[in-house]
Swiss-Prot record:
Keywords associated with the record: Hydrolase, Multifunctional enzyme, Purine biosynthesis, Transferase
Lineage, opening ranks: Bacteria, Pseudomonadati, Pseudomonadota, Gammaproteobacteria, Alteromonadales
Gene that produces this protein: purH
Keyword Hydrolase tagged: yes
Name this protein carries in UniProt: Bifunctional purine biosynthesis protein PurH
Stated family: Belongs to the PurH family.
Domain MGS-like: 1-148
Organism of provenance: Shewanella loihica (strain ATCC BAA-1088 / PV-4)
SUPFAM superfamilies: Cytidine deaminase-like, Methylglyoxal synthase-like
EC number: 2.1.2.3, 3.5.4.10
Pathways per UniProt: Purine metabolism; IMP biosynthesis via de novo pathway; 5-formamido-1-(5-phospho-D-ribosyl)imidazole-4-carboxamide from 5-amino-1-(5-phospho-D-ribosyl)imidazole-4-carboxamide (10-formyl THF route): step 1/1; Purine metabolism; IMP biosynthesis via de novo pathway; IMP from 5-formamido-1-(5-phospho-D-ribosyl)imidazole-4-carboxamide: step 1/1
Entry remark concerning the domains of this protein: The IMP cyclohydrolase activity resides in the N-terminal region.
HAMAP family assigned to the protein according to its UniProt record, in alphabetical order: PurH
Length: 529
């Protein structure tokens, strides 16, 4: 192969030693001469792998406590030397070609994440020689092979075994892309860290000025190209975080069905994040990013049946999320009753898979169990900029709630209030949710005035012949006027949960008292746009 390049000499210098010994042994078995530094060289030598210290190769010792090890012309000339062009210069300067470099970088992210990390700790974990070698090797990918991830060690060895000790241009180019992605992410982390800090009195100390850096750097990996975006004339792709550490649509495994669309992904995310709020068996049905039916049951089948009952019309072509293992009985109820785009659950039983398999186009996803929530950010693109905020993970406990009316909620009402409040958090503002016995009765979403959202919730309930009298109501934000309270009372709502905080709170409370309703304040708003 004319684009194949033989590996005769390799430089190995890694912070994470995972798999490096086996990689070195395999390279040695292929007749590759090994150069290395510091701890990596000691590991190889201690395990009987012949290795040349870089300082012996360059004739220059490591200096400044290891800060300068590989920054030498005999190293970078060997990496950057163009085969067929630079041989004379290399020979004149006693530079030998280095055909492969395996490097991973100082653990900067892990260091700054540790409690008590000082500026000095952070600075000493900024790798200099490593990124320089990575970039040099990736730049000269026409002739040299760069490996920055231990998962690629086997790939390189297998290719060498299949190509008489050589790697192909296709592989070198792909590894070069991974290398540039790696150094970009690394530099981005460093810039983000320093961009939040201001120096203190000591040159070795600093403190956080803001949790948001002055230049924001992040890196996402393309999971899949999408057929189109929100609309058919828009191109789209799905990118995910580098390290996903919680159950999500981004980390879910698709077990069957057509490829996920842009809207499928957005709606599935909304459904899954909502159902995660519940500890009892729960089902959430979403249409156009809004819950149209949510319920708790003694099991998932009952939860699904009750959620569907809220709004069967909107449930058609919807997304269904569960917070427990999907069983065959529940799966049968879904596929026999309605057209569904996506079903997602932490676990899907084999029997449930067999049931859904009869509907080949249904997208069935398994996301894994979730534990505690992890801190993360939300992004909203605006023309010319990006809004960044903490993800809304706030949720009040019953002990946080303040009863503001003369009438106290009953125990049953309080349970429904907490259920209703969790649902309202995931409904587009202005959001009004009616609920009774841990089941949504009506959902009013996205209206420009809060009173109209209340009217929509009432209309939805009436359309499905659901009894509103005795239900509770949740509002994602405060009521600016008493008209929303009057509308709720007219519909038969017995109890209201809302953040409070309006300049007319006293008037709102008086209206609730006038109607004999109970009302509680959470002190926390849940706008969703």
């Amino acid at each position: 192969m004319n684009n194949a390049r033989p590996i005769r000499r390799a430089l190995l210098s890694v912070s994470d030693k995972t798999g490096i010994l086996e990689f070195a042994q395999a390279l040695h078995a292929q007749g590759v001469e090994l150069l290395s530094t510091g701890g990596t060289a000691r590991l190889l030598a201690d395990n009987g792998v012949p290795v040349i210290e870089v300082s012996d190769y360059t004739g220059h010792p490591e200096i400044m406590d290891g800060r300068v090890k590989t920054l030498h012309p005999k190293v970078h000339g060997g990496i950057l030397g163009r085969r067929g062009i630079d041989e004379i210069v290399m020979e004149q300067n006693a530079i030998k070609p280095i055909d492969l470099v395996a490097v991973n970088l100082y653990p900067f992210a892990e260091t700054v994440a540790k409690e008590g990390c000082t500026l000095a700790d952070a600075v000493e974990n900024i790798d200099i020689g490593g990124p320089t070698m990575v970039r040099s090797t990736a730049k000269n990918h026409k002739d040299t092979t760069i490996v920055v991830n231990a998962k690629d060690y086997d790939r390189v060895i297998q290719e060498m075994q299949a190509n008489q000790g050589s790697t192909t241009l296709e592989t070198r180019f792909d590894l070069a892309i991974a290398a540039f992605e790696h150094t970009a992410a690394y530099d981005g982390m460093i810039a983000n860290y320093f961009g939040t800090m201001v120096p203190a009195h000591s040159q070795d100390e600093c403190h956080q000025d803001s949790k948001f850096p002055r230049t924001y750097n992040t890196q996402l990996v393309k999971k899949q190209d999408l057929r189109y975006g929100e609309n058919s004339h828009q191109s789209a792709a799905f990118y995910v975080d580098l390290n996903i550490d919680e159950a999500s649509v981004a980390s879910a495994t698709q077990l069957q069905g057509k490829a996920l669309s842009y809207n499928n992904i957005a709606d599935t995310d909304a459904a899954l994040e909502c159902v995660k709020e519940f500890s009892e068996p729960a089902c959430v049905i979403v249409k156009h990013a809004n819950p149209c039916g949510v319920a708790i049951g003694k099991d998932l089948l009952e939860a699904y049946n009750r959620a569907y009952q809220t709004d069967p019309t909107s449930a058609f072509g919807g997304i269904i999320a569960f917070n427990g293992e999907l069983d065959a009985e529940t799966a049968s109820a879904i596929v026999e009753r309605q057209f569904v785009e996506v079903i997602i659950a932490p676990v899907v039983s084999q029997a449930a898979r067999d049931v859904v398999a009869a509907k080949a186009n249904v997208r069935l996803l398994e996301c894994g169990q979730w534990a505690s929530k992890t801190r993360s950010l939300d992004y909203k693109r605006v023309n010319g900029g990006l809004l960044i905020q903490d993800r809304d993970q706030g949720m009040v406990e019953m002990s946080d709630i303040k009863v503001v009316t003369k009438r106290q909620p009953t125990e049953a009402e309080m349970k429904d209030l907490m259920f209703c409040w969790k649902v309202a958090k995931f409904v587009k503002s202005n959001a009004i949710v009616y609920a009774k016995d841990s089941m949504t009765i009506g959902v009013g979403a996205g209206q420009m005035s809060r009173v109209y959202s209340a009217k929509v919730a009432g209309i939805k309930a009436a359309d499905e012949n659901l009894e509103v009298v005795g239900s509770v109501m949740a509002s994602d934000a405060f009521f600016p006027f008493r008209d929303g309270i009057d509308a709720a009372a007219a519909a038969g709502i017995s109890c209201i949960i809302q953040p409070g905080g309006s300049i007319r709170d006293e008037e709102i409370i008086a209206a609730a008292d006038e109607h004999g309703m109970a009302m509680v304040f959470t002190g926390m708003r849940h706008f969703r746009h």
